[in-house]
Swiss-Prot record:
Subcellular location: Cytoplasm; Golgi apparatus membrane; Cytoplasmic vesicle, COPI-coated vesicle membrane
Segments traversing the membrane: none
GO cellular component: a single term: nucleus
Domain of life of the source: Eukaryota
Family: Belongs to the adaptor complexes small subunit family.
Gene3D superfamilies: 3.30.450.60
Record text on subunit structure and interactions: Oligomeric complex that consists of at least the alpha, beta, beta', gamma, delta, epsilon and zeta subunits.
Classification of source organism: Eukaryota, Viridiplantae, Streptophyta, Embryophyta, Tracheophyta
CDD domains: Zeta-COP
Functional note: The coatomer is a cytosolic protein complex that binds to dilysine motifs and reversibly associates with Golgi non-clathrin-coated vesicles, which further mediate biosynthetic protein transport from the ER, via the Golgi up to the trans Golgi network. Coatomer complex is required for budding from Golgi membranes, and is essential for the retrograde Golgi-to-ER transport of dilysine-tagged proteins. The zeta subunit may be involved in regulating the coat assembly and, hence, the rate of biosynthetic protein transport due to its association-dissociation properties with the coatomer complex.
Membrane topology reported for the UniProt record: Peripheral membrane protein
Name by which UniProt lists this protein: Coatomer subunit zeta-1
Species of the source: Arabidopsis thaliana (Mouse-ear cress)
InterPro entries tied to this protein: AP_mu_sigma_su, Coatomer_zeta, Longin-like_dom_sf
Amino acid sequence: MELPPKVKNILLLDSEGKRVAVKYYSDDWPTNSAQEAFEKSVFTKTQKTNARTEVEVTALENNIVVYKFVQDLHFFVTGGEEENELILASVLEGLFDAVTLLLRSNVDKREALDNLDLIFLSFDEIIDGGIVLETDANVIAGKAGINSTDPNAPLSEQTISQALATAREHLTRSLMK
């Protein structure tokens, strides 16, 4: 029986290697200091590369790390050495594109910190207990709340539950007239 792909962590670091948002799904780094040491080694190994246009891949401490940079943010997804790097790359692209949608294409550290709740919701929509659930950025962003801010959006751009709520609201208004 083939096991589903597993992710060990998702890291979002700033341009100095400091945490913006991180989530670990593995006990490979049991303490906070072990996690920070891993984050530092990942950042140090990748900081001189140019991963601004394409996802890059590297091996570190028996792990595969895929990463991409934008402005002052560095996105990383880590899997075991047996994981398929294309799957890890699709997880990273899904995360990156979902964050871009959620932050309305203004992807930088300040905006990420202001919307940390949406970023962590994105993590939760992509991965559950290390198992990949979703990689489609539109689905991830939709579930994390991109459409909940505009109740006047066309029905075609709303989720089913949001569309039903809007229809119910319109029906209630028309009945009260």
